[in-house]
Amino acid sequence: CRKVQKGQRMFNQSPAFQILRGGLAESAATSKKEFISAYITDTRLMGVVGLVLHWYLPENLTKDHFFQFFYMDAEEYGFDTYRSVLTAGTGEDALEAVDELRSVENSLIGCLGGKKTPLTEREARAVVQQYVDFNLRLKLPLPEGIEEYQFLLGPHITLDSDEALALMKKQSPVFTSEFQVIHYFLMR
């Protein structure tokens, strides 16, 4: 170590330091997100829908895939349940995450039965915003984890009538027989 005299400046002559991010720093809430896919169940006529969004997190080094699961009740409870899974896209961690993804999906959406209909990012954001608005209007609490889904709440999406109808059709099954119609009304 060299002794520095008063008034003299000491310059660091060692190589530049590099900051390495650890895996614990990876977070879905603060990471940049790129939309991969989304789907909604066609169970709206039952009064509830399940929504799943899949994001790629390009800035994360290991856990670079983020899945969001929403359970929404259109009649009474609004946006009722939120769960998420942050996982690696490849390797052994990804295989382990498959079980967790299936478990979360089955617990929230599997019981609904309906078909899974693909959505665009715009449609998925609109659905989340509609149910958050529902909760706020009825003074219902939002599910925990808002720091992970609040990015979906802005900017506000306004669907025109054609877009709104197309989105409603994606959430509702097509009746192909009179028996299905009768069954629907009996179950309601």
Predicted regions and their residues:
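Non-catalytic terminal/accessory regions
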Residues: V4-R188
